[in-house]
Amino acid sequence: MKDLADHLFDILENSVKAAATEVKIILGIKDKLFFCKIEDDGSGIKDEDVTDPFVTSRKTRKVGLGLPLLKRAAESTGGSLQIYNSEKGGVILEFKIDIAHIDAKPFGDIARTFVDAIYSWPKVSFDIFIQKKNNKKLSIFNSKKIREIVSYSEMQQKEVRDFIYDSIDRELKKIKIDSQFGIF
């Protein structure tokens, strides 16, 4: 996976495969540390080490590389990856990456990743937050609320898709999440 956007899509896909209907994403940057927390209401994880590439619930192949690659990407910068079951059910995944580290991957187009997820899995509610420096969380997109306002056919229009993308991208750039790391 070439960038963090690829890793995010993989995590979101894991949530969907675990029958999640609601996925909450919190992103932020604090002291050159990018952090991401994803919570879902899916089926949870077994006690196995899901960061072992030879542990997978997949039936088609006996290898799962997504989480091991994310763990390596995080730890190679001095960051971390934690995955655990939520008390409410589902999974909580948190990772941190030192974006000032020479081995840090670029962000990639995270806004496009979210739009692709929203359109790929229309029955899943995605609630996206950014965490400000003062630790306040700001909701920047909620697919469930949008679907209450906009019809399915309207959602398919390019103008609506572009509006959703621009809205998410604008908010991510406010906390310096752009397709490249840039200079802080």
Task: Kindly label every feature range from the protein language model.
Residues 2-111, 128-136:
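Conserved beta-strand-loop-beta-strand hairpin that lines the nucleotide-binding pocket
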